[in-house]
A protein has these predicted regions:
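N-terminal export signals
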Residues: 5-25
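Glycan-recognition and catalytic cores of secretory/periplasmic carbohydrate-active enzymes
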Residues: 25-443
């Protein structure tokens, strides 16, 4: 299907939220909601759930257990290739926070087994030993196996926010309220740093390359994305007015400022005052973050029971996926460097595809919208035919590739095992499918 056809497949469906629920569970229109006979991606819901379980419990988790998890010192040694061969034993503070969240979430929602809680606990204990001393200092980005800094913080707050996300989810798993309090302290620190007018001047290089002009104090869609995800998960555990303000501020920034009415797409970078820059950055649309941010905002609309907001974010999610879709080889591109010139980065990253799968399944679960089913079906077919490496003897999936995601090119990329976006997709979608099955009275 070409992009134009996909954009016009179905008029926007009325998307409402069952006000009594805080998690996605029931579509407003019971005549359209999925039932156990629903077929997605050529499978019944039960068959699809079984596939997701195999991908998670038979492939991903055993590989992590055998090759990546440091059972002695705690944490994750993710610098390894698809066979499990390690490049080194260094660890990343980003991947520690992310990994803690993954295993704590797994324990809380899918498999209440002590071994998973132990992995999460040992990871957070490991990374907390390298906690920075200064109130506004950030975590070292890379650590040795025993926790000594290899590289210092690079000025981005993402790593500390991922640690906060892990702490909060571990607090839920253990009942240790101190972990939640520490997470809030980290969020507050990150907001302070983000609000500085000189925050992260080199941010443009992430999207436009080394020659990108400095952009100190830019407002970054990716930062709002992580802030709202961390804050709203924490608010599911405990009411907190300060975190509510963080969540509302993040939603407002994306909804009313990053959204470009002319493009009907989200700009990644804005001026510090949230005005649109009068230079090349006004043409930058990082579709990967746009898609990822919007499914998170769908969850937030559900949490705050705002039906109209859900509708808006569903429409914008659909628009971003449609524009980013590669009509020739399939999948979505992640980086539209210049809208008017139609200038894209032509690689394919797994995480961006998995964000499409999360968002489209969420919309379909709650509405039964034909366009969401179609989006999920074709993206799932593309992903499953492109990224899994079983044909090469590995249970993991390629984390990135060129436009065609060719295996020989993938092998030339940095050796890394992705321990966050992939299991997050598997877990969130497995939970969504199970909810759909449960509501049909069959399991």
């Amino acid at each position: 299907m070409n992009r134009r056809t996909f954009l016009n497949t179905a008029a926007t469906a009325g998307i409402l939220i069952a006000a009594r629920e805080r998690t996605p569970g029931q579509a407003r229109n019971p005549k359209r909601r999925p039932d156990p006979t629903t077929v997605l991606a050529g499978r019944t819901l039960k068959q699809l759930a079984e596939q997701y379980r195999r991908d998670l419990f038979e492939d991903f988790l055993p590989f992590m257990d055998k090759y990546i998890i440091d059972h002695d010192l705690g944490g994750f040694m993710c610098n390894a290739d698809y066979t499990g061969e390690r490049v080194n034993t260094n660890k990343s503070s980003w991947f520690e926070g992310r990994g803690t969240w993954v295993y704590a979430f797994l324990y809380n929602n899918l498999a209440r087994e002590q071994k998973y809680l132990d992995v999460a606990t040992k990871s957070i204990e490991f990374v907390l030993r390298s906690r920075p001393e200064g109130e506004d200092e950030l975590w070292p980005k890379e650590l040795t196996r025993d926790g000594k800094p290899v590289t210092q913080a690079d000025g981005e707050i993402y790593g500390d926010l991922f640690i906060a996300e892990g702490l909060a989810e571990l607090s839920k798993a253990t009942g240790n309220k101190q972990y939640w309090d520490e997470a809030k302290t980290l969020v507050r620190k990150c907001v302070r740093l983000y609000d500085r007018e000189d925050y992260r001047p080199a941010i443009g290089q992430t999207y436009l390359g080394r020659t990108a002009r400095p952009f100190p104090g830019a407002r970054i869609q990716g930062v709002w994305m992580v802030l709202v995800r961390v804050a709203t998960q924490m608010l599911e555990m405990r009411n907190d007015p300060e975190l509510e303000k963080v969540a509302k501020r993040s939603v407002d920034a994306v909804l009313n400022h990053h959204f470009h009415p002319g493009f009907q797409l989200n700009n990644e970078l804005l001026n510090h005052d949230l005005s649109r820059p009068a230079n090349e950055y006004s043409q930058l649309v990082y579709t990967g973050h746009g898609i990822e941010t919007l499914w998170m905002l769908l969850f937030e609309a559900i949490r705050i029971r705002d039906n109209k907001l859900f509708d808006t974010f569903a429409d914008r999610f659909r628009r971003h996926v449609s524009v980013a879709w590669d009509d020739v080889y399939g999948g979505v591109f992640r980086n539209l460097m210049n809208v008017d010139a139609n200038l894209w980065t032509l690689d394919k990253v797994l995480w961006a595809q998995e964000e499409v799968l999360i968002g489209s399944l969420l919309v379909f679960e709650r509405t039964g919208a034909p366009w969401a089913r179609e989006m999920f079906d074709r993206t799932y077919a593309y992903v499953m035919s492109t990224f899994p490496l079983k044909k090469y003897g590995s249970p993991v999936w390629a984390y990135a590739g060129n436009r065609k995601v060719e295996f020989e090119e993938f092998k030339t990329r940095p050796k890394r095992i992705e321990n966050y976006h992939h299991p997050r997709h598997l877990m969130l979608n497995l939970l969504a499918i199970d909810r759909m099955i449960d509501r049909g009275g069959k399991r």
